[in-house]
């Protein structure tokens, strides 16, 4: 092979590589991939709208039924209208029981776990994986309902992110903005006094939306820590929002939380995600 042929071959190979795009990028329409997220294999259901060349990312978190595929499907309307690439990971129960999923892996058997092992850090790894596949630092938002909302509230309280918006829909419990209440239902017993104040302030400054179905009022909670926050999912959301707002005002801190309510809807991810209020909840 002469020099001219070698140069021509190299140029053509480079051209092909540049035009081929990311090998494992989510396809147009629905998809399913098994992803190694920092050593943890996870199934991720995806949706990419047609006619949307550079979508931002929406990571969706399922409830206790762990039906990530359904949650992916519930957000397709949002994705089409807002140009969103949807990724809905499955947190399998065997690997992610309640303490490690909805309560964030912060505390197990009353013992605070190593911060490097908190489950929310997997979200950062998953976002990094998507960015590598897309070959660009796309912006992202997080959306969770029920147990997925509980998980995202622990993430918002304990794990710094670059999320444009973190939407917590109809969560069964929250991290109450207090250092007097032990984690994972408050921020207590995790930090030193100085670090705790900084963590509390950062929590209130998060771009967090508490998104509530006004009909989610059934008193079906058997957890005393959650019941201390209110007698229903709806009331707990109202109470934690008001407590956060009042504390921020008292301390002179920025308060970036938003409260969005949906009349006539109870504990339904499908209805919450398909309502016009979902756009308000997700807006940066």
Q: What would you call each of these model-derived segments?
A:
Residues 52-55, 60, 64-97, 176:
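Short substrate-entry loop that stabilizes the transition state in hydrolases
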Residues 21-57, 69-70, 81, 109-111, ...:
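A domain-start/cap signature at the N-terminus of enzymes
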Residues 165-249:
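The feature captures the conserved acid-bearing segment of alpha/beta-hydrolase catalytic domains
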Residues 9-20:
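Bacterial N-terminal signal peptides
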Residues 1-11:
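Bacterial N-terminal signal peptides that target proteins for export
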Residues 92-117:
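Cap/lid segment of the alpha/beta-hydrolase catalytic domain
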Residues 122-138:
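Conserved acidic catalytic loop of the alpha/beta-hydrolase fold
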Residues 211, 221-222, 241-284:
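C-terminal catalytic histidine-bearing segment of alpha/beta-hydrolase fold enzymes
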């Amino acid at each position: 092979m002469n020099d001219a042929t070698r140069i021509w071959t190299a140029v053509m190979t480079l051209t092909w590589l540049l035009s081929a795009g990311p090998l494992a990028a989510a396809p147009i329409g629905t998809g399913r991939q098994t992803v190694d997220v920092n050593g943890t294999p996870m199934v991720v259901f995806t949706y990419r709208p047609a006619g949307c060349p550079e979508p931002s990312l929406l990571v969706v978190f399922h409830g206790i039924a762990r039906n990530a595929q359904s949650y992916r499907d519930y957000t397709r309307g949002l994705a089409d209208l807002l140009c969103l690439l949807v990724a809905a990971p499955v947190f399998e129960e065997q690997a992610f029981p309640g303490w490690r999923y909805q309560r964030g892996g912060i505390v197990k058997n009353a013992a605070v776990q190593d911060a490097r092992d908190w489950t929310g850090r997997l979200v950062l790894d998953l976002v990094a994986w998507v960015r590598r596949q897309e070959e660009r630092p796309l912006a992202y938002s997080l959306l969770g309902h029920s147990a997925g909302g509980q998980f995202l509230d622990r993430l918002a309280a304990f794990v710094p992110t670059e999320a444009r918006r973190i939407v917590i829909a109809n969560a069964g419990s929250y991290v109450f903005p207090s250092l007097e209440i032990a984690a994972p239902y408050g921020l207590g017993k995790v930090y030193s006094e100085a670090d705790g104040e900084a963590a509390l302030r950062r929590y209130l400054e998060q771009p967090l939306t508490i998104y509530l179905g006004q009909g989610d009022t059934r008193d079906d909670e058997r957890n005393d820590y959650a019941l201390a926050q209110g007698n229903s999912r709806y009331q707990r959301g109202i109470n934690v929002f008001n407590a956060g707002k009042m504390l921020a005002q008292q301390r002179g801190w920025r308060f970036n939380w938003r409260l969005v309510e949906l009349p006539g809807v109870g504990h339904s991810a499908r209805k919450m995600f398909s309502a016009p209020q979902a756009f308000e909840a997700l807006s940066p």
